[in-house]
């Protein structure tokens, strides 16, 4: 992709998962630049300081108005995914949301319609490609350390407390 312009990325929400996204983008994906991060909590500014190209905002509308984003990732609590995604999609910004897309099916359908109307891509992030256990399993398979595989089944158990789902 030599000569192509960098994709300008913004984030809304910089809780625990944000550092994983920032690491993957900085270390594994060429031609992408984190230009802005928004979180209502001013103390989260510290988590953004190591990203030289990023400007920190506490107001979503101000970030959207001042930055010409190609993509925005919604990493906020589940209860506000709809509100934040709607702002981005109405601005014609390609939007990727951490799971779940919304808490109500009607809201998810509305976001899908907004994406179509505004020529934006809407996606939900479900992959675990860069999780350490998944990378280890992939390496074991690639190194053929398991022998002939007949069937593989994986179950992932984790729990979230109520704070995770509040919005």
Regions found by a protein language model. Give the residues of each.
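N-terminal Rossmann-like dinucleotide-binding module
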Residues: 1-51
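Structural signature of beta-strand start/N-cap positions in the alpha/beta core
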Residues: 8, 33-34, 68-70, 94, ...
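Beta-loop-alpha module in the N-terminal Rossmann-like domain of NAD(P)-dependent dehydrogenases
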Residues: 21, 55-114
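Receiver (REC) domain switch-region micro-motif
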Residues: 37, 72, 152
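Rossmann-like NAD(P)(H) cofactor-binding subdomain of soluble oxidoreductases
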Residues: 80, 100, 123-129
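Rossmann-fold dehydrogenase core element
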Residues: 110-127, 147-152
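Predominantly a Rossmann-like dinucleotide-binding segment in NAD(P)-dependent oxidoreductases
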Residues: 128-167
């Amino acid at each position: 992709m030599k000569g192509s312009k960098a994709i300008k990325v913004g984030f809304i929400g910089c809780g625990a998962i944000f550092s994983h996204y920032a690491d993957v983008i900085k270390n594994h994906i060429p031609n992408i630049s984190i230009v802005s991060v928004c979180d209502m909590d001013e103390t989260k500014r510290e988590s953004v300081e190591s990203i030289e190209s990023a400007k920190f905002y506490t107001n979503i509308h101000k970030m959207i108005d001042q930055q010409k984003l190609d993509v925005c990732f919604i990493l906020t609590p589940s209860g506000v995914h709809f509100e934040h995604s709607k702002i981005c999609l109405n601005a014609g910004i390609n939007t990727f949301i951490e799971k779940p897309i919304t808490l109500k099916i009607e809201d998810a359908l509305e976001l899908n319609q907004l994406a179509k109307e505004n020529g934006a891509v809407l996606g939900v992030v479900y992959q675990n490609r860069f999780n350490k256990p998944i990378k280890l399993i992939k390496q074991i398979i690639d190194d053929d350390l398991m022998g002939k595989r007949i069937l593989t089944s994986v179950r992932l158990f984790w729990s979230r407390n109520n704070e995770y789902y509040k919005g």
